[in-house]
Amino acid sequence: MSEARRGIFPFSKIKLMLASPEDIRSWSHGEVKRPETLNYRTLKPEKDGLFCAKIFGPIKDYECLCGKYRGKRYEGKICEKCGVEVTTSYVRRQRFGHIELAAPVVHIWFLKSTPSKIGTLLNLTSRDVERVAYFESYLVIEYPNEEEEEKFEKDEHTIPLNDGISTKWVKLHVVNEEEFEEKYAFTIDEKYEHGMGAEILKEVLSKLDLDAYSRKLKEIVKPYSIGFEDLGKEIEQKYKNLYQKLIKVIADDFRAYGVEIKGLEDHGLSLEQAIHRILNEELYLNVETGEISLEDCGDSCLTGRDALKEYYERVREHKKDIPIFEKIKEDIRSTVLREISEARIRKALRTLQLVEGFKKSGNRPEWMILEVLPVLPPELRPLVALDGGRFATSDLNDFYRRVINRNNRLKRLIELNAPDIIIRNEKRMLQEAVDALIDNGKRGNPVKQNGRPLKSLADYLKGKQGRFRQNLLGKRVDYSGRSVIVVGPELQMHQCGLPKIMALELFKPFVYRRLEEKGYATSIKHAKRLVEQKTPEVWECLEEVVKEHPVLLNRAPTLHRPSIQAFEPVLVEGKAIQLHPLVCPPFNADFDGDQMAVHVPLGIEAQLESYILMLSTQNVLSPAHGKPLTMPSQDMVLGTYYITHDPIPGRKGEGKAFGTFEEVLKALELGHVDIHAKIKVKVGNEWIETTPGRVLFNSIMPEGQPFVNKTLDKKGLSKLITELYIRVGNEETVKFLDRVKELGFLRSTLAGISIGVEDLQVPKAKKKIIEEALKKTEEIWNQYVQGIITNKERYNRIIDVWSEATNLVSKAMFEEIEKSKRIENGKEYPGTFNPIYMMAISGARGNRDQIRQLAGMRGLMAKHSGEFIETPIISNFREGLSVLEYFISTYGARKGLADTALKTAFAGYLTRRLVDVAQDITITERDCGTVKGFEMEPIVEAGEERVPLKDRIFGRVLAEDVKDPYTGEIIARRNEVIDEKLAEKITKAGIEKVRVRSPLTCEAKHGVCAMCYGWDLSQRKIVSVGEAVGIIAAQSIGEPGTQLTMRTFHIGGAATAQKVQSFVKAESDGKVKFYNVKLIVNRKGEKINISKDAAIGIVDEEGRLLERHTIPYGARILVEEGQEVKAETKLADWDPFNTYIIAEVGGKVELRDIILDVTVREERDPITGKTASVISFMRPRDAMLHTPRIAVITEDGKEYIYDLPVNAILNIPPEKISLEWRVCPTCSESEETTIQHQYYVVKDLEVQPGDILARIPKETAKVRDIVGGLPRVEELFEARKPKNPAILSEIDGYVKIYEDADEVIIFNPRTGETAKYSIKKDELILVRHGQFVKKGQKITETKVAEIDGQVRIKGRGFKVIVYNPETGLQREYFVPKGKFLLVKEGDFVKAGDQLTDGTPVPEEILRIKGIEELEKFLLKEVQMVYKLQGVDINDKHFEIIIKQMLKKVRIIDPGDSRFLVGEEVDKEELEEEIQRIKLEGGKLPKAEPVLVGITRAALSTRSWISAASFQETTRVLTDASVEGKIDELRGLKENVIIGNIIPAGTGVDEYREVDVIPAEEKVLEEKKEPKEGS
């Protein structure tokens, strides 16, 4: 916090520390010795009690307790009689007392936090420390003898104690009574010390030698970060064994890759010894020849690590097939990690962090044990007398009473020399009493009263009702009121109607002042009386005061910034606030009983800011997406739609021509021309054919705007408003909006539009459509009964039929409505004037779906699970529903209500986490000057462009020049802002990727710079410094979440299943281009694609890509490469309900491991009696023992193997399949007895390329709404691992697939011989399951088949190996059975490509592909969830949240920094540390980026105040106090909490220097001066 922003506080940072006993005593004003509170007769506080006036101060202002001194003149005097200081009673809120504890007590927060702080320091488990603290066990300290000292020092489990003379390493044992009696009770020697309770813990903690401890722990964790760069003498001395192993790794690698070091025999050395001596710089290596020598032999002789690396690189230049040197480095790292137990290092790191925390902060460990307990000031734990002589008290008083009682009893027992066991029990009870006071229920059962747990100090801080969230972050304020809202159509947009009675109350002080100024009242008291009597003068003054004094209106829930706006009040009669109809959408307000709150900004600055920044006219555009928020709706839309409707032929005045708008309006007013007549009017120099209605609309347009000659619906209006905003600016647009409101209301009223049952026309074609659909479903049932399709397919197809039928009915209905003429008021109108139709089409109310339900058919309904009920509701609301249909309908309605309730809370919590993680991001500077940028490309999902490039780059700043890819001319320069025109220009030039500046790459030290952020979308200009963009981002993402979850219930659960896409058409003319398309031709001569990632593109003459569509595996391709096509040409089609397994070659078919009731179940359908063979494992074991496959063997004997995943259905004609009993070698072997199975066998079945071998039915159609989407958003933001994670390749390379099994069996069916081979973990199996092998054929690299026969493998799954021949790197992945492989043997994959199905894990993407790819992935995934719902949110908001998720790095090698290995620190902190070390010239730390979920990111923020007010208050405060954390007060939350001006908006340093002097006061001051002199 800078000097300027300190405001009223004499500090700029806040540090949290442990309080030492001396501190506590120094705060205290006296010791509380008695548990009494007030005297019940006199109601005066008892002396030395919990409310003692002597300790805490007087009860009445300036009056001592006995009444001897009264009045301000005695201030500061201490009464001799009662000992009370005469001062204000306010000190009772400030003065602490204290209790001297008779025995030390452990502070429960440091005992029971996970992991326990005391436990971590003493190297004991948390349970052990607890047992000692609660007198269940003894703590025995074992000191070393002289001969044991070195052993103890090396032992990991010892801790250093310093007795003031020297440091000794000791062991701690926690033993129970019996063990203690047995082993230690009678040993008198100095070797053991023992004790119980907090005393012994305090003793040990106070003796702890932190420096020695820290040194030892650093040694333990050091080897964790050893890499090739660290090898040398230094490491050897400390870690001999490890060093030897690492040398062996290097030697082994050198041998394996044939890198030889020459001259070993001459020196009598082994390779290991030579490498050892080179690393220790005792030998020289000639990197040219590979000779070793004892002397330096010139330039080409090197020694140490560099010699080995350099020599290896030279050898690799000649031998390309050996891996790059990175491979050796990797081997060294993996050996280090293998040798060192991770858990041990983690534990040491935790302890080290804690020890370092104590060292840096200046806290002492023994302060975690309390000797003195502070007592809260009495006003903060009040005791109030109720009527009837009862008292209401704060729970804390009960706790303090119990502590004092127990403490006094303990003192008495100690004085009486009571038996040890009694004293121990009393000490335990004291410990428990203090625990309950600090954190009730943290250990054991909470202390209750009348069955309610009492609230302890911790409870007063944490949770929604705690101090932080209830009283510091959200306060109730004065000068506010709330009332119901009603519509105020005659208001202007910047006004609101404020009830007079409310205004009088809100503006009271202003009214008093005005009454005095005008001489109506002589004093404030007099003014008060006038206001109470409500005299006419009062109303006059109120009018003057309210004029031009803005008020803030707020509607809860306040989901985003526009939920609070400023208005100028207009005084109205009645008791309801009047709201302008245009500002309803941003508030999400309607007038069915909503309430709103009014707040009065008091200061002149506050009023100014309300006017300039918060006035409703300044909030036309949404900060989330930059489109208008303040929009005409309902009647206003309907009115404008009605008057701008297409002309109706044959109306009065048709064909007339008018010279000016005025003439048209005059004629319209006099009734000479009908509002929908076709007329001509002169605009500028040309004649335009239009209608009087459209002229009327254009007459309210701002001057100089082009003539709008089209029907305007809601979308059209929105677009128009945006265009006007760009062209004429804010002020004119607002005036126009107000005129639209007037016109819309007026015209929709005059049109007399209303709805009647007659307007709902049930289409005549409905009956036929339904009959057709029923016929189709019957056919599908028949196919199912004959066994042609499975139950799942039947379901999918029926759903499809009904979706289509619903769409047809709805289409027919709209067509009929449009065609049927109407007679209104004796005039004939076309069908498009049907009121219901107009309302829906114009976007005024309702939508096509709702009309379809009213007059078409309700259609399919969804179940709770999200599937559709396959019998649709055929009736509509006009015809009425049958009982069954009504019953089915209730489903959806209930689901809607239940969802709403649950999801609102969920969305609210998501918003809260987002706000917390991003709250401290503000715009801190104009330009950070970075050259980095973020690459933007259109978002493409399933082959279609979901978000075009121009929408993504609009409002951003370019990070580099944009050149035309064809001409090379520069279209736009770096640091230019992209507006709509430029965005359009860039996309027209055929540019696919643009690098823009982004918050993700911004290099501003704190927050983000204005250039990287780009436009403030609500103002359409570069964002100003000080804007709280983090909060805006969080609200923009959170608000639609809440909105959408609330919206489910409006549709009433009638689901519209998307008709499944089963083909793709060209959208534009051009040439066909194939991407990765692999074709085979099937029996029918059709071209079938068998590539997994194929796409078809359309390019124009110059070869620019116009569109691109992904084509699934098994699709039929209908065009040739290079073919010229017109738009709407079908390019490919496929079966949307199944995935196929297709024979890619022709040949004979063999079935392998397809065994009845083991790997195949015959699904006999109860209804159809037909069976389908479905792959599924009957027992989990079968999945290990068998792998069902189909093999196709070509004429030249090559095998093509197709694995059958679970749920695959065999597509082989039943007559070709027979069952045979055979011995199953794998089962027989595992059960150790002969077991036979029924195998499926195929007799001479030939297939041709393109034949379908099996099909896998797809998941059933489900209803998609954001409810499914919100958990996905949460999963992404919390960086959770998805349910079904995909396996990604870590390197580029070629795929090899091997079986993964413990053993291979070869079985000869003729002789019945079997041979078993057990397979080691890292051996690769070279044969496939079911393959025939000859004797002598290799099974693995080392094992050979001893007999002819068929291979049986007990597979667990597959080993997929990715090998890169160029670098020599390889990675292997285990793919379990049941996971679907997306790659085939021999495919080339890139790093980060998916090898299996599933959702990629964000952390993997970060590790493999790096930060930018991860950012792209997260951004696209989250955007898609919202886009599916049609919610528009600008990328920059997501980028800010993602920036916060990636702000941490993990230290791999600390170098000379203050960090520890494995510690997660902010990038900023790392940067600061690197700068410091560069100046001092030390070794720089190394770090890797980490991805942190939003909850963790919010908790690990640098500000402890902000973290504590978010979640897990206790833990945050405990950690912060131990480390002595300093809060720099940079973010918004921490400043709100301490009551400071927040560092955003006008609270930024830049603006704080400016002073505002109101003009009036200046004048008054000048006038006053001569007065004083006169």
Swiss-Prot record:
It catalyses: RNA(n) + a ribonucleoside 5'-triphosphate = RNA(n+1) + diphosphate. Zn(2+) 1 binds at C64, C66, C79, C82. Its cofactor is Mg(2+); Zn(2+). Binds 1 Mg(2+) ion per subunit. Binds 2 Zn(2+) ions per subunit. Signal peptide: none annotated. GO terms for cellular component: DNA-directed RNA polymerase complex. Mg(2+) binds at D590, D592, D594. Zn(2+) 2 binds at C928, C1002, C1009, C1012. Keywords: DNA-directed RNA polymerase, Magnesium, Metal-binding, Nucleotidyltransferase, Transcription, Transferase, Zinc. GO terms for molecular function: DNA binding; DNA-directed RNA polymerase activity; magnesium ion binding; zinc ion binding. Disulfide bonds: none annotated. It is an enzyme of class 2 (transferase). GO terms for biological process: DNA-templated transcription. Its EC number is 2.7.7.6. The RNAP catalytic core consists of 2 alpha, 1 beta, 1 beta' and 1 omega subunit. When a sigma factor is associated with the core the holoenzyme is formed, which can initiate transcription. Belongs to the RNA polymerase beta' chain family. HAMAP family: RNApol_bact_RpoC. DNA-dependent RNA polymerase catalyzes the transcription of DNA into RNA using the four ribonucleoside triphosphates as substrates. This is DNA-directed RNA polymerase subunit beta'. It comes from Aquifex aeolicus (strain VF5).
